[in-house]
Structure formats: structure tokens, C-alpha cells
UniProtKB/Swiss-Prot annotation:
Lineage of source species: Bacteria, Pseudomonadati, Pseudomonadota, Gammaproteobacteria, Vibrionales
Catalytic activity: heme b + 2 H(+) = protoporphyrin IX + Fe(2+)
Keyword rRNA processing: no
Pathway(s) per entry: Porphyrin-containing compound metabolism; protoheme biosynthesis; protoheme from protoporphyrin-IX: step 1/1
Family membership: Belongs to the ferrochelatase family.
InterPro entries noted in UniProt: Ferrochelatase (IPR001015), Ferrochelatase_AS (IPR019772), Ferrochelatase_C (IPR033644), Ferrochelatase_N (IPR033659)
Listed GO biological process terms: heme biosynthetic process
Gene: hemH
Full protein name: Ferrochelatase
Residue intervals passing through the bilayer: none
UniProt entry tagged with the keyword Cell inner membrane: no
Keywords on record: Cytoplasm, Heme biosynthesis, Iron, Lyase, Metal-binding, Porphyrin biosynthesis
Length: 320
């Protein structure tokens, strides 16, 4: 049946602090870590730990990290996400808005921006190629919460994941080849994905399967053997076991295996952010070099590359 309703696209990402200050970071972390999708501990146990220990200690430290990657226009995640929305709108010629699960602009703000332009049917594209309950499902939760505050809600379709879309692997491969053309090719390619607690995967989260498939599809696009590429998980915190192998431990071990030069990328991140620009580019590089590595080269996220925008347009076209 033909859809006669005016359509729009809501691009969604995780979110970012409004400022690289302890207060700004504390507000963001508080909202983020209050979500049961992120930390599903009993509230009476978790909230005192969060507000009494984690936020007072972590906010000032994380603020300094944000300051090291902050751009003139603001947070890298927000800047690149805004560029994506602008380019996608220009390509599709329909309204495109940006919403964040945590922080600003909120999901509610993004939806209202579209509805103010007469949009009645929204295609929601969470910019998480691999599904996880900690990220993608949190977007669905956030939309439901936003809709509860609206007298009239739009119809909408939800793109759950796109790790298997051919244009996604092609865009990743193109970014790798472009990096190789400019910087030369290292001995080995490391694909570092954001981790989740192993317990969540044991309970049924399909994220690790999507990450493994992504790595296999990328290797196929690049013509790499299993010996040429390694998949790891980063960003763990707390004492709980997370998905393995861990990125930092893997980087420590590679030089002893004769792998002294590596390229590293973060396929789960649609835009560069703190976890890529600071954790990978700085911390992981230091870990690898200290372990005996000689050459560490970070391959940037897809950000607002034309191939990335083209892929988004192809995804949206499936729902128009």
C-alpha cells in the first residue's frame, strides 16, 4: 500500500555531555548510568554507589578526557552526527533530525522537530550497526517514554540493525583501503568493538554474534585471512567479566607474536567519539607501544563519509 504520509528520518546515537566540564559530564553519566538497559542492578544497591562513589570520582576524570578530544564546534560525537543528518537530508530531500538516547538533543526533541515540519511517518535509524539491548533497545525505550508526553504520536518504523547490509561492509572496507593508500598497510588489522558484560550475552543478547559477523564480512571484502585480522572488545568497567578477548590485553600480546605494526578500527561506532579518539588513539596506542609494538595506526570511523551517507540512504529506502 502506498504511503501518503509525509516521511522523515530520525537518526539516533548514544549521546554526549553538553560540555567538557565535571558538571556537564556528571549530568550525562547520571542519566546514562541510571538506565537499566546499561546497568541492570537493583536500584537500592546501585543508586547509592552511583551517586556516592562513581559520579564524584569519575566525572572530573572523564571531563579531562573529553577536554582532550573536544572540537571547536563541540563534542566530536555530536559534531559528526549533525553532519551526518545534514548530508542525509540533502541526499534524501526529506526532513532528517537527530536525537540522542541520553543528553541533547533528546529523542523527544528530534521527534518534535520532524513533526513540526509536518512529518507523520518517521523512519528511526539507530546508528548502531550491531544490535544490543544496551544500545538499540534503549532507543526503543526512550521513544516510548517520549511518546507518553505527546498528545499525538507519529507512526514509525524502526531499523533494528544493519551489520549485514552489504553497503555497510563495503563502506568499512573502503575506509580501510583509503587509510592504506595514505598511510601504508600494517602487519595486522584489529577490529575493536565496544564490549558488554558477558552475563548479558549469556542471557541472550545477540551483540557478539553481530560483531563476529561484521568482522567476517569485512575480512571477506578486504580479502583478508583469519591470520590477518583480530576482533576484540574494549571499554569494560567494573569487576564483572565482559566479552573477550579484551582489546588492551590483545594489544599487549601481539608484539610477542611478531606483530609489531597494526592498524586498528572501531566498526561498532558510527562516529568518532571519546572511546575512539581517546581510548583507542591514545590509551591503546600507549599499551601497544609499551608492549614492544613499533607502529600503531588508527582508522577513523565512517563519520560523514559519502559511502556512509549512501548506505544510510539505502537503509531508509527500504522503508519508504
Amino acid at each position: 500500500m502506498e504511503n501518503n504520509k509525509k516521511q522523515g528520518v530520525l537518526l539516533v546515537n548514544l549521546g554526549t555531555p553538553d560540555s567538557a566540564t565535571p558538571a556537564g559530564v556528571r549530568r550525562f553519566l547520571s542519566e546514562f548510568l541510571h538506565d537499566k538497559r546499561v546497568v541492570n542492578l537493583t536500584r537500592w544497591l546501585w543508586c547509592p554507589i552511583l551517586h556516592g562513589v562513581i559520579l564524584p570520582i569519575r566525572a572530573p576524570k572523564v571531563a579531562k578526557l573529553y577536554q582532550s578530544v573536544w572540537m571547536d564546534e563541540g563534542s566530536p560525537l555530536l559534531v559528526y552526527s549533525q553532519r551526518q543528518a545534514e548530508k542525509l537530508q540533502k541526499k534524501l530531500q526529506i526532513p532528517v533530525a537527530l536525537g540522542m538516547t541520553y543528553g541533547n538533543p533528546s529523542l523527544k526533541t528530534g521527534v518534535e522537530q520532524l513533526m513540526d515540519q509536518g512529518v507523520e511517518d518517521i523512519i528511526v535509524l539507530p546508528l548502531y550497526p550491531q544490535y544490543s539491548g544496551t544500545t538499540t533497545a534503549a532507543v526503543s525505550d526512550g521513544l516510548t517514554k517520549a511518546f507518553k508526553q505527546m498528545p499525538v504520536i507519529p507512526s514509525y518504523r524502526f531499523i533494528r540493525d544493519y551489520y549485514a547490509h552489504p553497503s555497510y561492509a563495503k563502506a568499512l572496507a573502503e575506509s580501510v583501503r583509503s587509510h592504506w593508500d595514505k598511510n601504508g598497510r600494517a602487519d595486522h588489522l584489529v577490529c575493536s568493538f565496544h564490549g558488554i558484560p558477558k552475563r548479558l550475552a549469556d542471557e541472550g543478547d545477540i551483540y557478539p554474534q553481530h560483531c563476529e559477523a561484521t568482522t567476517e564480512l569485512l575480512a571477506a571484502e578486504l580479502g583478508l585471512s583469519a591470520d590477518d585480522i583480530t576482533m576484540t572488545y574494549q571499554s569494560r568497567f567494573g569487576r564483572e567479566e565482559w566479552l573477550k578477548p579484551y582489546t588492551d590485553e590483545t594489544l599487549e600480546s601481539l608484539p610477542s607474536k611478531g606483530i609489531k605494526k597494526i592498524d586498528i578500527m572501531a566498526p561498532a561506532f558510527s562516529v568518532d567519539c571519546l572511546e575512539t579518539l581517546e581510548e583507542i588513539s591514545d590509551q591503546c596506542k600507549e599499551t601497544f607501544i609499551d608492549a614492544g609494538g613499533s607502529d600503531f595506526s588508527y582508522i577513523t570511523c565512517l563519520n560523514d563519509r559519502d559511502s556512509h551517507i549512501d548506505m544510510m540512504a539505502e537503509l531508509v529506502a527500504l522503508y519508504r
